[in-house]
């Protein structure tokens, strides 16, 4: 973790599972809280929680979006990683593509901002404003939010779901499955309950 929050002291007592009513309440509460912190309209955006990391969440975006993803912005380590990942996801370009960029490239300290894109905000949120009208915005529980590591946070514009693979496709990287489970306050995989508690 970096930024002003360099140390995290946590003592957590978890006495419920990820399928418990307490977790469902925690999940729904955290959804509302994160949308408020992000300043995103709950009628226009959904928020998903993915056990793992911000990097895994970005990989899930590449896996889930139907069209190819072009990486734009300043060069740097994460620009190169996402470009490589994009090249490893061959998709038909006949119907267009979507742009993705890293808002704060930590390898060189450069920032980039463009509206109406997919945004890697893992190292920028919440100290940098979310760019205007993002299709998807990805961050994580640790880094600048200062909670325990292990939870990716993905905001998706509701009108963008038509660009996402069906929830019928079984994969732990399928964002649509996280949306389906999120409606009932759960995740499709075992959730890191302690991280949810600490983030709240």
Label the predicted regions:
Residues 2, 51-57, 74-79, 105-107, ...:
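Gly/Ser/Thr-rich loops at beta-strand to alpha-helix junctions
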Residues 3, 142-200:
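Active-site C-terminal subdomain of aminotransferase-like
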Residues 10-60, 77:
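Conserved N-terminal alpha-helix of the aminotransferase class I/II PLP-enzyme fold
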Residues 11-12, 54, 86, 120, ...:
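Buried hydrophobic positions in well-ordered alpha/beta secondary-structure cores of metabolic enzymes
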Residues 56, 63-99:
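PLP-dependent aminotransferase-like
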Residues 90-127:
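Active-site phosphate-binding strand-loop segment of PLP-dependent enzymes
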Residues 99, 117, 137, 152-154:
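Short, well-ordered beta-strand core segments
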Residues 131-142:
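Conserved active-site segment immediately N-terminal to the catalytic lysine
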